[in-house]
């Protein structure tokens, strides 16, 4: 009996170890699709169209990773998440990654059981008000009622700003951005606050968007990016290098339209990027043409930015900090070699 018990415990230990060693990529491959947590409805970043298709900058990142793994950008299951549940689904393993314009902070990095591979959008928190209010900058909101989404860094930044500037205000909390924006439109509060990219997106939903203005004041730094469950460094690396590949492609002028032609390029950096030379897919558990797949299906970072949130979109946001480092931005393409 003792020997049977020991054998059973050993087998159980072996099974647990095997399960622990089964990485995210292996589970994704076995399942046949990537599960990606995303925003419920944020134009430019994650929103579902009338035809049921999801689009946005964060959505493109999920599709890019699916392209790298499966050579098919549609092998993604999207799971819309609220601000209160977005990190829970990562920690529980319900999703393989979260791409939902979430802010990378110290506490989230050190105590939330998650890793943040990259920043795919550098932002800052601001305010949106009715033009008729006559306010031109944030300090003019003394005594104002502010709508904000509860359980977010946005709510904390709001309190910090008014306390630091010794201003009085009334906070009106909501479970989602959508509820807060509707309250602003209905006149239940004087201002709504979130990341400026989100303000630009939410403004588009108003029946009379020209009646509202986003104030120029930024009250915080908001590095936004995807999050994954901590403990699988290989998966962190895969997410990271898919983003870097899209940045490299933009740096070298490789686009969705010319990627096939670029396979003939004599530039050694482009050869490595597209898998013509070297075996840079092996370390990621991918084929060596993984980056070619990403660019062929999704395009480079600049293309994704422009069609979703840039001047080619309804949001018409400037690149700013999200431009390449070679043009004064913070998006720095790491070398593939």
Please describe what each predicted stretch is.
Residues 22-99, 286, 301, 324, ...:
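Extracytoplasmic small-molecule ligand-binding "clamshell" domains
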Residues 280-337:
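C-terminal functional modules
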Residues 16-20:
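Sec/Tat signal peptide C-region and signal peptidase I cleavage site
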Residues 6-13:
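Bacterial N-terminal signal peptides
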Residues 35-44, 54-69, 103, 123-179:
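Bilobed "Venus flytrap"/periplasmic-binding protein-like clamshell domains
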Residues 29-30, 66-74, 91-95, 103, ...:
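Sec-exported extracytoplasmic/periplasmic mature domains
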Residues 63, 67, 71-140, 197-218, ...:
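Acidic, polar ligand-binding/catalytic clefts
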Residues 60-63, 67-69, 131-135, 139, ...:
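Extended ligand-binding regions for polar small-molecule ligands
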């Amino acid at each position: 009996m003792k020997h049977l018990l020991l054998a059973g415990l050993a087998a159980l230990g072996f099974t647990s170890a095997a399960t622990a060693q089964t990485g995210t990529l292996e589970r994704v491959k076995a399942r046949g699709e990537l599960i990606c947590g995303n925003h419920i409805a944020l134009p430019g970043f994650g929103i579902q169209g009338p035809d049921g298709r999801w689009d946005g900058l964060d959505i493109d990142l999920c599709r890019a990773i699916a392209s790298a793994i499966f050579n098919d950008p549609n092998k993604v299951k999207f799971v819309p998440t609220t601000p209160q549940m977005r990190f829970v689904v990562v920690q529980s393993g319900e999703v393989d990654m979260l791409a939902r314009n979430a802010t990378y902070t110290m506490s989230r990095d050190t105590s939330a059981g998650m890793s943040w591979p990259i920043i795919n959008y550098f932002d800052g928190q601001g305010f949106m008000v009715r033009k008729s209010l006559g306010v031109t900058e944030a300090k003019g909101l003394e005594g104002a009622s502010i709508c904000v989404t509860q359980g977010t860094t946005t709510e904390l930044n709001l309190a910090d700003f008014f306390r630091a500037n010794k201003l009085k205000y009334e906070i009106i909390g909501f479970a989602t951005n959508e509820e807060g924006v509707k309250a602003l439109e209905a006149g239940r509060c004087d201002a709504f606050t979130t990341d400026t990219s989100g303000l630009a997106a939410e403004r588009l939903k108003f029946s009379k968007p020209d009646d509202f203005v986003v104030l120029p004041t930024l009250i915080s730094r908001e590095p936004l990016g995807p999050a994954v469950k901590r403990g699988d460094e290989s998966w962190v690396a895969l997410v990271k290098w898919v983003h870097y590949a899209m940045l490299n492609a933009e740096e070298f002028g490789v686009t969705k339209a010319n990627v096939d032609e670029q396979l003939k390029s004599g530039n050694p950096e482009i050869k490595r990027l597209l898998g013509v030379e070297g075996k840079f897919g092996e370390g990621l558990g991918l084929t060596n043409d993984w980056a070619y797949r990403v660019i062929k299906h999704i395009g480079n970072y600049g293309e994704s930015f422009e069609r979703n949130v840039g001047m080619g979109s309804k949001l018409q946001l400037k690149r700013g900090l999200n431009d390449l480092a070679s043009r004064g931005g913070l998006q720095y393409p790491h070398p593939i070699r």
